[in-house]
């Protein structure tokens, strides 16, 4: 999207490691309008300090912070409380939870959502969900907290098991101390749940 579609609309992207706030700030240009990142990132599970990135808005007031929170929905992580302006989710994953809806949601202040709705909906990004798909997404939200907590508990147990396996070279999971700085940030902002997603490298 950022390399092939957005340039058609006069939008260019600079790619940086958002876990490194100094690198993010160094990449800001006069015409920068958005800092967009996914945390934890797929598939590396690197964790961006949302509050630290959001502090850049104190210096660069025209910039919006957009966080893809698909891997860490409530009750794991609350980007807006940490200073983000807009949060996006693929509701096909955790929010729906039943594999029978394809869609996404954008969350934020009414003023920001009004701009997105007026400029993008139906013109660029597609149409709203059908009523039945919306109903099924709401159905999934009723069990979201229960499902997510169990996913996270199971993922942590599996990650710890894999980390001690002779067949596994490296496990990437924010809830493991071996993730270093990513773990430290995850402890601070992910409410002790981390995520239900794991990636790992198998030994040759």
Predicted regions mapped to residue ranges:
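Conserved PLP-enzyme active-site core in the AAT-like
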Residues: 1-167, 172, 177
